[in-house]
Amino acid sequence: KDMVHWELIGHAITDPDELDLSDIRDSHGIWAPDISYSNGRFIIMATLRLNADGKRDNNVMRRQVVVSSDRPEGPYSKPSWLEVDSIDPSHFVDDDGKHYMVISPGINLVPISDDCTRVTGDLIPVWPGTGERCPEGPHILRHGDYYYAILAEGGTGYGHGINVGRSKNLFGPYEASPYNPLMRQLDPNAPIQRTGHGKLIEDANGDWWVYYLMGRPNRGIEVANGKAPKPGEIRVPGAYTTVGRETGLDPVRWLDDGWFVINEGKGPSNEQTAPDLPEVVYPKWQRDDFDSDTLDVHWQFVRRPAPG
């Protein structure tokens, strides 16, 4: 409720018969879930990364999964599978009511049904990005007279970032922002690194924010010749983000020229003033006596335990 404190309330897919990951390799499985709200329903889209390598005909690497519910805590619908072999889906509804799955690489639009359960047309490429490596994590935002195409670029390691382009036509052409990269950590010794894959949100006061992926490495990154690493480059073995990808929040400001900047162009903040919303702090889950027949919702595993 305050955009800072969060409480785990459930899971979108709970039936193993609906999503069997028992044979899926480590680091594969469900990737990059995105949640949106449309027509009174919460819609979650995600990628299922399969074991295939995509190097042979009909060797599908990825499928897209969609579930929905009229309540954020669920229960959610049975999964619908959209056969689009890519990653990082998100949901966009245009002013004319048409629904699209937005998917990488770059910004591509896949026409889908109003309930988001079926592909209804061919994939439409609209913006490849700025030319940096790994254009992914795509979102489309309609604001004022423009469509904004928001991308993660630079790879998901050190040098990860957020770039944006805009167009007055959904299908382009898009021009890149003169303020790119909108988000990137340029200080190799900063405690927050690998910042990218962001999604904008407007709060109840009309203020804008971006949630984004980030990581906190065990130690800093070596600087060569006084320069920070290039996008995707790691110079020090062992500069690992042990707890994995985390979530950052920074303010967004719309400019008079119609573009926006994140955190005044300063990169990710180490500390930030919270949104001006009533604070809601949930009790921390710290103990489990295992006195129930079912595990608490907070227990999570990479895969379900094997039977027996």
Annotated model-derived regions:
Residues 1-308:
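Carbohydrate-active catalytic/glycan-binding domains of CAZyme proteins
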